[in-house]
Amino acid sequence: MSNNNKYYDKSFSPLGYVANGQKGVMRSINWNVINDPKDLEVWTRVTQNFWLPEKIPVSNDLKSWNELTPEWKQLVTRTFTGLTLLDTIQCTLGDIAQIPNSLTDHEQFVYANFSFMVGVHARSYGTIFSTLNTSDEIEEAHEWVINNEKLQARAKFLVPYYTSDDPLKSKIAAALMPGFLLYGGFYLPFYLAARGKLPNTSDIIRLILRDKVIHNYYSGYKYRLKVQKLPKEKQEEYKKFVFEILYKLIELEKDFLRELYDGFGLADEAIAFSLYNAGKFLQNCGYESPFTPEETKISPEVFAQLSARADENHDFFSGNGSSYIMGVTEETQDDDWEF
């Protein structure tokens, strides 16, 4: 902090005030003095990318939805309900848990924003259900979620780390959900969109994916900032932890995906898609991916869906996608009406 901001060292953020036994004075967040430029950069990108599922014409997918067999309809509905559970956990536990351990006041606000963003993702699946499904189908899917042991096992796995006394382990867990665990489910709408099915629904998934890329990148970045300050021995301990927790989660994910996609022939490539993104997660944390090209091989038509229609790629600084554009209002001048 510069000398012009002496107040900073004499005060606490509201969370810091509580952690200090409610002693001292609280400061307001100052967006005119940025401790870490990445906080403002990510905040700006997230707010520029803001979207709502109600703006996506999911009803245009009704024709192709009705062309699916009952088995495929159930698979889609269950897959999306499983994703809803993961986003429910991330919204109400994962991102909230990062706020008290933030390095800056602005990081607290970024994670508060992330929590809302993930809430929008969870809501978006509800929009899809209310458009495509009957009430009985929705009820069946939510019943399936609470009764599927393999789904529950992978969903519960990260919870103890979110609430851990170790902020770095919590940070890794917060990065694993948007960085790895969701992608086996994301694979299905991209597979269908490549075959002309549910294109507007897949647009929603692309928008979610765009947000997840930012989410995972930022958590990995904050993890690296903290780890690099530690002694080498401690750094190696955390590296070992990251790989151990990831490999355990991969096994849980494989078990779940093989059951989910049983009879549809999609499990192997969905697993490859998950491993591809597991490698990206590791890179965001500062580690090399151990996965071979063969392990992460995805069919070209599915891979192309990552950028189709939304006109996006995994460089989140490239801007909004074409599938969802927010309007910009500009006051007109007299000269504008001289044709």
Curated annotation (Swiss-Prot):
CDD domains: RNRR2 (cd01049). GO terms for cellular component: ribonucleoside-diphosphate reductase complex. Its EC number is 1.17.4.1. Fe cation 2 binds at H215. GO terms for biological process: deoxyribonucleotide biosynthetic process. Pfam families: Ribonuc_red_sm (PF00268). It catalyses: a 2'-deoxyribonucleoside 5'-diphosphate + [thioredoxin]-disulfide + H2O = a ribonucleoside 5'-diphosphate + [thioredoxin]-dithiol. Provides the precursors necessary for DNA synthesis. Catalyzes the biosynthesis of deoxyribonucleotides from the corresponding ribonucleotides. Belongs to the ribonucleoside diphosphate reductase small chain family. This is Ribonucleoside-diphosphate reductase subunit beta. It comes from Mycoplasmoides gallisepticum (strain R(low / passage 15 / clone 2)) (Mycoplasma gallisepticum).
